[in-house]
Amino acid sequence: MKTLFFLSVFIFLLLHLSPGKMEILLGSNGGARCDINKKSFDCYHRNGRCRFNCRKREYNNGDCSQYQSCCLPTRNL
């Protein structure tokens, strides 16, 4: 019963906390986080690596300055 309770709390937190807050909660360095355009993507550091979260797809090429390669805003056609 306790396992079910903790699992439900964990799932609730996953669904309701932003990635940065979740990283701090789980203890992964709480590294620097640089939101360039919150509506379309986030660029942040996790475990010494740079990651891009672009429309719910994560890219990891190690260079936050290259965010354009995966995170260009798209127009609605």
Swiss-Prot record:
Keyword Disulfide bond attributed: yes
Disulfide bonds: C43-C70, C50-C64, C54-C71
Principal place of residence: secreted
UniProt entry tagged with the keyword Membrane: no
Xref: InterPro entries: Beta_defensin_dom (IPR025933)
UniProt GO BP: defense response to bacterium; innate immune response
Signal peptide: 1-20
An example Gene Ontology CC term for this record: extracellular region
A Pfam family hit: Defensin_beta_2
Superkingdom per UniProt: Eukaryota
Subcellular location: Secreted
Distribution of this protein across tissues and organs: Lowly expressed in spleen, kidney and lung.
Alphabetic keyword roster: Antibiotic, Antimicrobial, Defensin, Disulfide bond, Secreted, Signal
Cited function: Has antimicrobial activity.
Family listed: Belongs to the beta-defensin family.
Protein's UniProt name: Defensin-B6
